[in-house]
């Protein structure tokens, strides 16, 4: 299983590290995403909240939306982590896919974290590339 760790701070929506665009192939069906959520560089409290992860194509077509598991540990090493383990729905199409993490609190207020990109290469290339020659 491939594991990608992605950090998001809702106080700094423009900060997007370059490492946030994992590259996988359609063969990769066991992919785990760990999102570490912060607010002002501190773990944010998700008490009573639900977290949803949506994947969209470049054409803004929603591939699917799913609820994620929330792991919150505010003890010695404070961390708020959202975990999602993918299945074949994510890698059924090749191309650039955008992941959007939405937090919905107990009052229904929605917070969207900055999106991340995911490059999915096809199973087999239809045309020869320079590597093939």
State where each predicted segment sits.
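Compositionally biased low-complexity segments at domain edges in trafficked proteins
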Residues: 129-133
């Amino acid at each position: 299983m491939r594991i990608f760790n992605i950090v998001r701070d809702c106080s700094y929506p423009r900060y997007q590290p370059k490492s946030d665009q994992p590259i996988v192939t359609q063969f990769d069906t066991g992919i785990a995403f760990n999102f570490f959520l912060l607010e002002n560089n501190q773990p944010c409290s998700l008490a009573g909240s639900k977290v949803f992860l949506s994947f969209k194509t470049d054409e803004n077509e929603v591939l699917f939306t799913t609820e994620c598991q929330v792991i919150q540990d505010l003890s010695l090493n404070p961390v708020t982590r959202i975990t999602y383990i993918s299945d074949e729905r994510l890698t059924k199409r090749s191309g650039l896919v955008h992941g959007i993490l939405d937090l919905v609190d107990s009052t229904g207020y929605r917070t969207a974290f900055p999106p991340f990109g995911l490059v999915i290469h096809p199973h087999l290339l239809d045309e020869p590339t320079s590597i093939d020659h």
